[in-house]
C-alpha cells in the first residue's frame, strides 16, 4: 500500500493551516532576534511612568484589574505592578515589553498599535490618539 495519498493529504492540511498564519513586517533590514532593545533607561524613566502606568489615570495598561497586570492579566503582555518596582522587576517588564516591539518598523509595533485609536482592535479600548503625547514618547524611545 502506498503512503503517497497520506503524504499528499498531510501536505494539503499543512498548507491549509499555514494560509491562516499572519505575517509581520520586520522592515527592510530587520534586526537579529533579541536585538530590539531601545534604551532601557528611557523605558524606566518615561515609557513605564508616562505611557504604561501614568499616575492619576483610571484607565491604563496596568490599572487595578488591568489586562496587562501580571497577577490578574488576561493577555500575553503581563507586567509586574508595584508602587516601587525593583531593578529586577523593571528588567523583567522591559524584557516583556520588548517582545511587542518592531525595531525595523516601530510604527508597526503591537505595543503601539493596540492602544492607539483606530489602528488595531484592542480589548481594553483605545487609550490614546495618533499624534498624542504617548505616541510621541514611544517614537522618541527609538530615537534615543
Residue ranges and their predicted role:
Residues 21-144:
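Aromatic- and Gly/Pro-enriched helix-to-coil junctions and flexible linker segments
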Residues 1-21:
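Sec-dependent bacterial lipoprotein signal peptides
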Amino acid at each position: 500500500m502506498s503512503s503517497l495519498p497520506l503524504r499528499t493529504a498531510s501536505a494539503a492540511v499543512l498548507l491549509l493551516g499555514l494560509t491562516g498564519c499572519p505575517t509581520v513586517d520586520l522592515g527592510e533590514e530587520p534586526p537579529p532576534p533579541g536585538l530590539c532593545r531601545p534604551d532601557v533607561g528611557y523605558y524606566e524613566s518615561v515609557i513605564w511612568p508616562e505611557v504604561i502606568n501614568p499616575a492619576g489615570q483610571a484607565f491604563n495598561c496596568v490599572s487595578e484589574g488591568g489586562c496587562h497586570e501580571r497577577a490578574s492579566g488576561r493577555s500575553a503582555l503581563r507586567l509586574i505592578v508595584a508602587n516601587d518596582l525593583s531593578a529586577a522587576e523593571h528588567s523583567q517588564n522591559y524584557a516583556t515589553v520588548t517582545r511587542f516591539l518592531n525595531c525595523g518598523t516601530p510604527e508597526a509595533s503591537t505595543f503601539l498599535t493596540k492602544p492607539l485609536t483606530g489602528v488595531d482592535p484592542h480589548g481594553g479600548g483605545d487609550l490614546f490618539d495618533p499624534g498624542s503625547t504617548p505616541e510621541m514618547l514611544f517614537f522618541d524611545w527609538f530615537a534615543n
